[in-house]
C-alpha cells in the first residue's frame, strides 16, 4: 500500500520517491490509496513525500512521523550513492600509451626546426650493449632523460657558477632501453624546469654506478664503465651539434656570427671525463692489489676473464668511447679558444672582441632571430659575487684561457695512456669525419664486434680502427690547440 504523509494539510508530490529519483513518470491506476504501477510491479514500498519548502525551514517539527523522516533520509543517501557509482562507470579509463623508459623525448624529433638531425651519421654504436636491433635509436641534440630549460638559473649546483653564462639541455641517456631496445610501459619523464636537478641526477648516477661497480662482477664493471662513457659521449655530441649547426647556418647565410658551445657545459664535460678515468684507475689498482693477495683458483679465473682488457682496465668499446669523446672536446674547444685568443690582447688595447656563447636550445641556438637577423652574441665573463670582469675583456679572456688550459692538461694526462695505445696499433685507416666514423661503426653487427675484440689479432679490430680514425681526425687541431694555450700561458705569465 501507498504510505502517504498522515497530515492532511501536507501537499504530496505527484511521484513517489523511487520514480522521482529515477526521473520517470509515476502513474497509479489503482487509485490514490494504492501503490504506483512500478512499485506494485516490483513489490516494493511506495512512499509519497511532501514538497520541500524553498528557503528557511519551519521551526515546528515535520508533520510527517519520525519513521517517514528516517526512511526519506535512507532513500536520499542510497540515491546519492547510486548516482556516484553511475558517474564512475560513465568515466572511461585513460588509454595506455607506449613510451620509452629514457631521458630522451622522442616526440621532439617530429618538432625539429630548420636543421635536420635525422642523418644517418647521427647513429652512435651501441650494438655491443646487447641491443636487440641492428639499428639503435638516433641520438638527437634535442634530448631530454633530464631536460633543463635553456633559461634556467646560471650555475645552480655547478662548479662553474663563477661563469656568468646560461645553461643548455644535456642528454641523459637511459642505457636500460638500449640494452633491450623496444617499447616500454613506463612513461617518459616530463620536462622539468627545476634548476640544478640535472647536476644532482648526474652526480647521483655516478655515485650509484661507482658503488655498484665496487661489488659487481668484471663483466658488470665493464658494462657500467661503457654505459658511463656512452652517456658522456652523447652529451658531448649535443654540444658539438650546436657548433656544427651554427657552422652550417653561417655557410648558407653568409653571416659572420661566431659559433661556439656553452663554456660552462664544456668545462663540466671535461671534468666528468677526467673523473670517470680517475675513478676507473683507482678501482683497478685496488682490485689488482686485492687479487694479488689471493692465490686460490677463483683469482686465476678472474684474471683470465680480464685478459682482453687494455691499460687501466679498458676494453675495445671503452677505448672507442674515450677516443670519440676526446675528439669531440677538441673540436668543441677549437672555436672557443680561437675567439678567446682574439680577445686576450695586451692591456691597453682597444679591442673588444668577445666569445659568443650560444646558450639556447641546440635546435634553435644558431637560427636567425625573430626580427630576421642573426642571434645576438653573449659575452662570457668571470664573476665572483658582485665582482665581474665583464668590463675587462682582455683580462677576462686570459683567465678563461688559463682555466681551459689547466683542465685540458688534466684531461690530456688522464687520456694519454689510452690514446697512445690507440696510436701505436698502426691500423691503416683513411682520415674521415668523426660522425662518418660513428656511422660506419654503428653499421657493424654484434658478432663482428665480439669476434674482433679478442685474441691475438686484436690489432685488426674495426673498433680500434674507429678509435684510431677518431684520434687521427683531430691530430692537427689538437696540436694547434695546445700550441695556442701554451702561447697564451707564456704571454699571460710575462704580463702578470
From Swiss-Prot:
Composition bias, Polar residues: 65-89, 207-218, 355-379
Keyword annotations of the record: DNA-binding, Metal-binding, Nucleus, Transcription, Transcription regulation, Zinc
Low complexity bias (residue ranges): 281-294
Transcription regulation keyword on record: yes
Positions of region (Disordered): 57-102, 189-224, 281-307, 348-379, 444-470
Cited Pfam families: Zn_clus
SMART domains: GAL4
Basic and acidic residues bias spans: 444-460
Gene3D superfamilies cross-referenced by the UniProt entry: Zn(2)-C6 fungal-type DNA-binding domain
Gene Ontology CC annotations of this record: nucleus
GO function terms (MF aspect): DNA binding; DNA-binding transcription factor activity, RNA polymerase II-specific; zinc ion binding
Alphabetized SUPFAM superfamilies for the sequence: Zn2/Cys6 DNA-binding domain
Subcellular location: Nucleus
DNA-binding feature ranges: 16-46
Keyword hit for Transcription regulation: yes
Function statement: Transcription regulator that specifically up-regulates the gene cluster that mediates the biosynthesis of fusarielins F, G and H, decaketide compounds with 5 methylations and a decaline core that act as mycoestrogens as they stimulate growth of MCF-7 breast cancer cells. Probably binds the 5'-CGGNNNCCG-3' motif present in the promoter of all the cluster genes.
Protein name: Fusarielin biosynthesis cluster transcription factor FSL7
